[in-house]
């Protein structure tokens, strides 16, 4: 009898009218938000963004910026696609707990809205825990998503400099140092089919074969796999990749063709296996430049001297490389660093 009563109440409750606002905006769990985001491009509901952000905050999904890049990109994309509603959406998104206010700040900065600075200033008092972060975006010390350039590949001499213990040029935020940016770009796409976001992901594809940086190889591998996986799941992504493929430079076209083939044949797991194998091999054998350094060190001082002469033209001293033409200093240094 008790079971019947509970079942009857459940059935009756199913037919009770829900409050209109709750039916439109509330999310019960983090998974509800993810499912909504997954369908958003087919049925945009920007008015639900504030409720989604608050639900994610309540589920502690925003505490780790490195794991919340997708949500940042999505929120930024929704704001950017709805400039006439952005002010209202931000107002309803706040307040947020101190630990989660960064998401609102970054979503505004990454939105691409012409008035994003005005919006940050206007709502700065409602995000007091991120006062310094806001100031850094306003004065340019922190870059917006569109301002972050793709890391340039180091030159041959810069590679040697790095392998000999020198530090590569560092950036506060870069695709090589911040893998969450890849998630952020996907979030922007899911918010409104942002073609530019996909293009930026494509520019990282050549890193899937990088032989000198484990960080780049890892991020390039992630780009290749997420492109294949999402293209296999979503027809719009696959169609966009096929449209872009013929116009890409060779360094992008070849891995993109692999992505399209894997998506068409539903064999994305193969790409994952191949990229994991490349990462494992890199961990075992190290940088190709470093291995080449070891080989060059044994070729003979004549070859080293040629390299030194060429390097002198671009200020070898500035690179921090010891170089004595015809002497043992360079050869010894190369052998030493290659062995590390």
Predicted feature descriptions by range:
Residues 16-17, 96:
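Hydrophobic alpha-helical segments
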Residues 5-16:
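Bacterial N-terminal signal peptides
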């Amino acid at each position: 009898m008790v079971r019947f009563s509970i079942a009857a109440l459940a059935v009756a409750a199913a037919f009770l009218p829900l409050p209109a606002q709750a039916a439109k905006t509330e999310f019960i769990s983090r998974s509800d938000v993810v499912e909504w985001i997954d369908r958003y491009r087919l049925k945009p509901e920007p008015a639900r963004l504030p409720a989604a952000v608050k639900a994610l905050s309540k589920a502690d999904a925003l505490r780790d910026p490195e794991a919340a890049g997708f949500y940042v990109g999505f929120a930024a994309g929704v704001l950017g696609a709805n400039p006439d509603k952005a002010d209202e959406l931000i107002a309803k998104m706040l307040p947020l707990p101190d630990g989660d206010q960064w998401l609102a700040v970054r979503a505004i900065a990454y939105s691409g809205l012409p008035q994003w600075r005005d919006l940050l200033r206007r709502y700065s008092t409602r995000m007091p825990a991120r006062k310094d972060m806001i100031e850094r975006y306003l004065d340019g010390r922190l870059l917006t998503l569109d301002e972050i350039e793709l890391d340039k590949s180091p030159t041959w001499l810069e590679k040697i400099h790095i392998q000999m213990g020198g530090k590569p040029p560092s950036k506060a935020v870069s695709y090589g140092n911040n893998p969450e940016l890849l998630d952020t770009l996907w979030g922007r796409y899911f918010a409104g089919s942002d073609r530019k976001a996909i293009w930026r992901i494509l520019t990282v594809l050549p890193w899937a074969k990088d032989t000198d940086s484990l960080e780049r190889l890892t991020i390039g591998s992630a780009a290749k796999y997420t492109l294949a996986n999402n293209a296999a799941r979503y027809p719009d992504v696959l169609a966009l990749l096929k449209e872009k493929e013929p116009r890409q430079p060779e360094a992008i076209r070849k891995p993109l063709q692999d992505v399209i083939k894997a998506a068409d044949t539903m064999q994305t797991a193969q790409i994952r296996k191949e990229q994991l194998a490349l990462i494992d091999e890199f961990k075992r054998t190290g940088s190709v430049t470093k291995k080449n350094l070891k080989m060059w060190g044994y070729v003979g001082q004549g070859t080293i001297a040629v390299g030194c002469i060429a390097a002198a033209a671009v200020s070898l001293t500035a690179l921090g490389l010891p170089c004595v033409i015809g002497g043992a200093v360079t050869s010894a240094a190369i052998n030493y660093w290659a062995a590390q």
